[in-house]
């Protein structure tokens, strides 16, 4: 096992490789040295369940590389980290996010270290007070139109973190998570109440912005990335 206290997993896919390249060109160059990151992509043709490419900061997992398989990709990547590293926390974000505050991870890690009781989960909290049908298929037409969300609290997929204890609990819920379509909801819904008692609220919109609001579209159009 490799000692690595903090690991950042960025959900990516081959189709959007340019987004990962732009992230590497910009904010990922400035993250703290104590933070190891991987872009996570799926590949059903793999012979093994997962493979770390440390030279290119890529984690490949044996799942489909499409949007509907995102819950499968996420839990597979957590299993890969759990089997490979001695870690304290996993941070998760997406390939369409840009970090706009270079002090973010220092601030967050310092806060996590001193928080009592220990926090196992954090991010921008979505509080589902009544069951409802998701309208997310209007943004991602590949999603089912009948997609119920039940009463729970979960952290938005833009960015959230999980302790090693939370990850190990979620691994036991892998089958349940893989049946879902919305990754962030699947994680929060399947995490135990005990591990959600001290969720750390983070105003992630103050620290992250969408990649489409950056120079990324212009650089793609100009063929510079």
Residue ranges and their predicted role:
Residues 1-21:
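N-proximal low-complexity "stem/linker" segments adjacent to membrane-targeting elements
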Residues 3-6, 32-36, 86-88, 116-121, ...:
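Loop/turn elements at helix/coil->beta-strand transitions in domains of secreted/extracellular proteins
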Residues 195-225:
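PAPS-dependent sulfotransferase catalytic core
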């Amino acid at each position: 096992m490799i000692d690595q206290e903090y690991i950042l997993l960025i959900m990516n896919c081959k189709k959007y490789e340019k987004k990962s390249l732009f992230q590497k060109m910009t904010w990922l160059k400035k993250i703290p040295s104590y933070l190891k990151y991987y872009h996570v992509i799926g590949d059903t043709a793999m012979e093994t369940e997962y493979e770390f490419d440390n030279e290119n900061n890529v984690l490949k997992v044996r799942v489909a590389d499409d949007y509907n398989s995102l819950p499968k990709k996420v839990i597979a990547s957590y299993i890969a980290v759990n089997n490979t590293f001695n870690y304290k926390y996993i941070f998760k974000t997406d390939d369409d996010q840009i970090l706009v505050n270079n002090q973010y991870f220092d601030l967050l890690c310092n806060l996590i270290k001193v928080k009592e009781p220990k926090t196992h989960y954090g991010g921008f909290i979505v509080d589902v007070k009544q069951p409802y049908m998701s309208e997310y298929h209007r943004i991602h037409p590949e999603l089912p139109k009948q997609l119920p969300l039940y009463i729970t609290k979960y952290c938005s997929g833009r960015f959230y973190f999980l302790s090693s204890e939370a990850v190990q609990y979620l691994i036991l819920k892998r089958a349940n998570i893989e049946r879902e379509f919305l990754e962030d909801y699947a994680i929060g819904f399947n995490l135990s109440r005990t591990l959600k008692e001290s969720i750390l609220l983070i105003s992630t919109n103050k620290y992250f912005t969408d990649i489409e609001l950056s120079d990324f579209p212009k650089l793609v159009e100009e063929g510079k990335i």
